[in-house]
Design a protein with these regions (language model features):
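Short, low-complexity N-terminal intrinsically disordered segments enriched in polar/charged residues
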Residues: 1-30, 119-129
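Alpha-helix C-capping/helix-to-loop hinge sites
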Residues: 12-15, 34-35, 59, 81-83
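Structured beta->alpha junctions
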Residues: 13, 38, 66-68
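A short gly/proline-enriched turn/hairpin at secondary-structure junctions
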Residues: 33-42, 111
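Conserved, charge-rich beta-strand/loop surface module that forms ligand/interface-binding patches
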Residues: 45
Length: 129
């Protein structure tokens, strides 16, 4: 289970980076919940989470630096680049906690060590709590 959990979250980031939204959606539980405690943003449901990623502004990339996984959960440490092929672009470290059940991602919680205000969202799925 641990290796499959690790593989699942790596597929999540690979599909996101590739903008392969069909593959991305297949990894998600219908009742997925996504939260960002720092900005108090929340998205409920796989369709909302997909829309959140699909409409993220800019040509970004998330490079996975580390994965720690055990049965039913995983953590990734990311180097998030705001411009895919520009090494001079802004970079942020992201720490993402995943919960997994029955081979699907059920909960995602993002932590960003640097303070920031979220960018304007094109997705109507994002609410603040």
């Amino acid at each position: 289970m641990t290796s499959s959990c690790k593989a699942l979250v790596l597929r999540h980031w690979q599909a996101a980076n590739d903008r392969d939204w069909t593959a991305f959606a297949e990894l998600l539980a219908d009742d997925l919940v996504y939260r960002v405690p720092q900005t108090r943003e929340q998205v409920r449901g796989a369709a909302g989470y997909l829309d959140f990623f699909r409409t993220w502004p800019g040509d970004w990339r998330a490079d996975v630096q580390q994965v720690i996984a055990e049965a039913g959960q995983a953590v990734t440490v990311l180097n998030f680049l705001t411009e895919r092929d520009n090494p001079q672009a802004a970079q942020m470290t992201g720490i993402t906690f995943f919960e997994v059940q029955d081979g699907k991602i059920t909960r995602v919680t993002d932590h960003w060590p640097e303070p920031y205000e979220p960018p304007p969202r094109a997705s109507a799925q994002v609410t603040r709590y």
